[in-house]
Amino acid sequence: RVTSPVRKGITMEWFQAALDRYKQQHHQGHAAPKPERTHSMRSVPAPIVYTRTRSVQVPEPVLREQRIMAGFDAGPFVDAFKILRTQVMHRIREKGWNVIGVTSPGEQEGKTFTAVNLAASIAMDVTQSVLLVDANLRHPSVHEMFDLGECQGLADYLLDDVPIEQLLVHPGIGRFVFLPGGRTVSHSAEALTSPKMLALVEECKHRYQSRMILFDLPPILQTSDV
């Protein structure tokens, strides 16, 4: 079982207010004009050449449509996740953690949106690398955030022994790699509590101590998976 150090209060009231302002601008179609791009505007580190990981260059229009912060230069939406990153990183360094989970009470409450953007914001720090694991095997959706079709992932590793190296995806954002959920698994609680899953979590924790591991978990009140 993955225990998340991210608590309800860590986002703070202004974080929700910033997201509300962004959503209002987004829906009304009055977003601030996009400034001219310069190399100094973003804190994205230099690209890494991934030789063993599948690399997919997600177009910027897709990032913007899906509200992934790497597609934006500035604004309250970007600032909100940068400060959430600061709060989370401070807490996990204080506790000595490198694995965290993101969940929600129910479905359609923005947990995958939050997990992807938190991972992206951490990966845009030149000193950090991030692995995001889609562990919501009943409804895997991290790959959909990047407009990718159905692909193999965690379920295929757990059930069919497909090597992890063949499943990882680099979406062209800093030092960000994600493991898709793969095919839908109806009895996901058994898969997520299997010895193989526990071994994977332990390996991630100890083999990649300099990398942050985020798990996009199932809703906490609707299934027995978390």
Identify the meaning behind each predicted range:
Residues 1-226:
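P-loop NTP-binding module
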